[in-house]
């Protein structure tokens, strides 16, 4: 079945061993790293208007525990801010919208919300009524490459590991015969194909910024976190290695006769890892936002590998950990193109290849975090 973004782009559902819920530690670690940026943006968004109801949206929320960690973090930031400014008797109501494509596991998300609400009530039972701001949480299915909110209605947008995904499967990329069998950018890929990846990101991110500008209130803030790259050279990105090893694993299944070569020739990952320069250039070109903060930091491929050294202590275990994380993200896309029957074998082979790679080179994700504010446009 051909890949369709709105249907197939979602994390692995449920609570099983290969689910996103069980394999989202990388995202958790990144959320911890961006806390200062999120706090600054949240305080600025609230301080701009001191709204009685503050609307916050998480775009590409998925359905794991990190979604509610974000909600909890924002609640805590607003509570601290109000206490510091002697407004604890005048908390805003917090309205959270958790947005993702319709294929997202919203059933699991709603169960998590129910548990979260019960936990909040239990933890603050008997405390003063003003202990925390009241919050209301809703799910919102739909593509963030369309308008999803009324004009000037949102105070804070947040998106973690979502805006680097394409809005749609590029027909030009699908129709290009990929004789190298690469699924992401490599040095062997024709320059025309590389350009298609870049152009799709530029088109999508420009549209995303224009849509969010319409939906943000004056003084509204946005914090976006991408898997990016450290260097401007498109061929030197860390993602090239990560996805290149997946391509090699798929090629090995072609050699074994388990995957049709024609299917791999027409398959690519609808994703792009941008550089700081590319992101800054698009923000400036669109001209609707002021840039507060942009930086790149690194985090180990292995979500459980916290050492800062250059060596991987257990490459086999690390390979398995990396494979579980990538499977939780890529499983629906891969299954839609090649079938579910190849998944176990594919990611076992991928784990082996990652382990071999890590024996020679400890590779890290380059994480790009961007904080921007809605600009005042004088007509």
From Swiss-Prot:
Residues the entry annotates as binding anthranilate: 27, 164-165
GO molecular function, one term: S-adenosylmethionine-dependent methyltransferase activity
Region described as Disordered: spans on this chain: 1-21
Stretches assigned to coiled coil: none
Residues holding S-adenosyl-L-homocysteine: 20, 61, 66, 100-101, 143-144
Catalytic reactions on record: anthranilate + S-adenosyl-L-methionine = O-methyl anthranilate + S-adenosyl-L-homocysteine; benzoate + S-adenosyl-L-methionine = methyl benzoate + S-adenosyl-L-homocysteine; salicylate + S-adenosyl-L-methionine = methyl salicylate + S-adenosyl-L-homocysteine
Enzyme Commission numbers on file: 2.1.1.277, 2.1.1.273, 2.1.1.274
Keyword list, A-Z: Magnesium, Metal-binding, Methyltransferase, Plant defense, S-adenosyl-L-methionine, Transferase
Pfam family of the protein (one): Methyltransf_7
GO biological process, one term: defense response
Compositional bias ranges of the Basic and acidic residues kind: 1-10
Induction annotation: Up-regulated by herbivory and jasmonic acid, but not by salicylic acid.
UniProt binding sites for Mg(2+): 265, 267
Role noted for this protein: Methyltransferase involved in the biosynthesis of methyl anthranilate in response to stresses. Utilizes anthranilic acid as substrate. Produces exclusively the O-methyl ester. Can also use benzoic acid as substrate. Low activity with salicylic acid.
Family: Belongs to the methyltransferase superfamily. Type-7 methyltransferase family. SABATH subfamily.
Protein's UniProt name: Anthranilate O-methyltransferase 3
Species of provenance: Zea mays (Maize)
